């Protein structure tokens, strides 16, 4: 038996730089080091929040790949809805995001969101399937700190107009239609928030 070896493969399309802290490796090729450090700090805060709030901990180092924008991200992945800003691959401890310096505030939330998916994936592996989408996404939005005002308004309007989506429809994936997808995230957060605060 040979000793375990580690190989890191980086998309050779870009000249990647790396910052490391705790169990996080943040890879970026665009933006300043201060921008990357800000995102790394947000990821560290997300790890801390998930650990104390939900008992979700990183089992091994997680690699965060920051593309310069969502267009660059979409060029690197296939078959994702147009509203996709990031993806998590829990089996490989990888997060990919498209974050420009002008979207730093959104990026801080998005990095915590996707990082939460990796942590949930570690805790909930099953040969029978994954956790319901509403639970996974609801936990991720909860870890971000809650809904932004526009998302809260959309949820409030759906409650008022009796146009909420069924929980069953939130269990197996979200719509490719952006407005339905955004409502799906908001509803999922609302369900998870209720469960956490009630039980």
Place the predicted regions along the sequence by residue:
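Beta-strand-enriched, solvent-exposed domains that form extended recognition/catalytic surfaces
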Residues: 1-13
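Alpha-helical scaffolding within the catalytic cores
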Residues: 11-14, 77, 154-155
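Juxtacatalytic substrate-recognition/specificity segment
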Residues: 15-132, 161-164, 174, 178, ...
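Short active-site segment of divalent metal-dependent hydrolases/proteases
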Residues: 116, 120, 140, 192
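Post-HExxH zinc-binding segment in Zn-dependent metallohydrolases
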Residues: 123, 130-173
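Pan-zinc metallopeptidase signature
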Residues: 165-199
């Amino acid at each position: 038996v040979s000793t375990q070896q580690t190989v890191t493969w980086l998309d050779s399309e870009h000249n990647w730089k790396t910052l490391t802290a705790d169990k996080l490796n943040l890879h970026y090729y665009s933006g300043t080091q201060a921008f990357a450090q800000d995102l790394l700090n947000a990821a560290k805060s997300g790890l801390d929040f998930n650990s104390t709030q939900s008992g979700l901990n990183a089992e091994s180092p997680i690699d965060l790949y920051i593309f310069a924008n969502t267009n660059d991200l979409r060029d690197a992945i296939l078959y994702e809805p147009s509203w996709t800003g990031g993806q998590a691959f829990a089996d490989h401890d990888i997060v990919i995001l498209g974050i420009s310096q002008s979207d730093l505030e959104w990026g801080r939330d998005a990095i915590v969101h996707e990082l939460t998916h990796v942590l949930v994936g570690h805790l909930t592996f099953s040969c029978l399937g994954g956790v319901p989408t509403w639970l996974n996404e609801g936990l991720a939005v909860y870890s971000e700190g809650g809904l932004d005002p526009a998302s809260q308004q959309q949820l409030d309007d759906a409650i008022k107009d009796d146009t909420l989506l069924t929980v069953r429809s939130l269990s197996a994936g979200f719509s490719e239609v952006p407005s339905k997808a955004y409502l799906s995230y908001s509803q999922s957060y609302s369900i998870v928030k209720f469960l956490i605060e009630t039980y």
